[in-house]
Amino acid sequence: MESLLQKVYDQENLTKAEMNILATEIFEGRLSKTKMAAFLMALKVKGETAEEMAGIAEAMQEVAIQVAFPAGTAMDNCGTGGDKSNSFNISTTSAFVLAAAGIPVAKHGNRSISSRSGSADVCQELGIDINMRPEDMTYLLEKVGIAFLFAPHVHPNMKYVMDVRKELGTPTIFNLIGPLTNPVHLETQLMGIYRRDLLKQTAEVLGQLGRKRAVVLNGAGFMDEASLAGENHYALYESGEVQLFTLSPEEVGLANYPLEAIRGGDAKENAAILRSVLEGEPGAHLDTVLLNAGFGLFASGKVATVKEGVNLARDLVRSGLAKQKLADLITYQKEVLTK
């Protein structure tokens, strides 16, 4: 163990297997807080590699509370957070549109990181229980096609790193790997990331973690979501290869809006925005969700282009199917809670 730590201190890269060993020590509470802090900062200064990100993500998944679902059928669309955009809950809203397309969505989420309301906060405001048993999450995935997985609930071993992360007060590798550690074995994934320089690398990591197809994107204004404010950069992983692309809102028939147009509020305000989008209320909020859902549909392989995805997303909202997914989730959740 000491030799692995020393490698990082000496600015040497770890292999995936070496990082897995070291991360297992962390998640089983065997690494002191002092050594953990030194390791995280040395890793940050050195720069995290794809092998290291995959190694720590796999170790985190191994100690997670497993949520059973047929392998190779579900997707996730959560992002890293950390973009300081204070936007409304874009990926959470988009998840209902993806589910309405018949894609099982295992939505990994947490409380607020860069905004006033995280995925878990707005879910609670909507009446969604974020602390359900694994078997209940499986039931909702099967019956409704969507379930929300509260990260601290499914990753209890993160308790060993929380104090150190808080004390350091700076982003570490844990800010990057959250979306990589969904306890459901995913086939496809849309992942927003706040660092554009890591698009290709993160897409490679998703491939190492078994995704068949994935899109990693960074929006205009360095958002961890697709943005209407300008050019969006994204990486597509498929068949073992990564390709880099850019896409502007105009290319998919959407208008430009400044970042200020999608500012969010607290959980109550963001829940109201989510409902208004699912009702089809026109404007920047709806168009932003259409763009992100379009990317999600493209990442899933449901459509051949993002533009086709945007058009399908619009149809799913107009038809009321996306709104119905929220209603169904609440209905079936009550059934679970009364068992």
UniProtKB/Swiss-Prot annotation:
Keyword Phosphoprotein found: no
Recorded GO CC terms: cytosol
Which residues take part in binding Mg(2+) 2?
Answer: 224-225
Q: Which reaction does it catalyse?
A: N-(5-phospho-beta-D-ribosyl)anthranilate + diphosphate = 5-phospho-alpha-D-ribose 1-diphosphate + anthranilate
Provide the cofactor list for this protein.
Mg(2+)
User: Which Enzyme Commission number(s) are on file for it?
Assistant: 2.4.2.18
Residues where Mg(2+) 1 binds? 91, 225
By sequence similarity, the record places it as follows:
Belongs to the anthranilate phosphoribosyltransferase family.
Subunit structure comment from the entry? Homodimer.
> In its UniProt entry, what is this protein called?
Anthranilate phosphoribosyltransferase
Q: Which organism is it from?
A: Listeria welshimeri serovar 6b (strain ATCC 35897 / DSM 20650 / CCUG 15529 / CIP 8149 / NCTC 11857 / SLCC 5334 / V8)
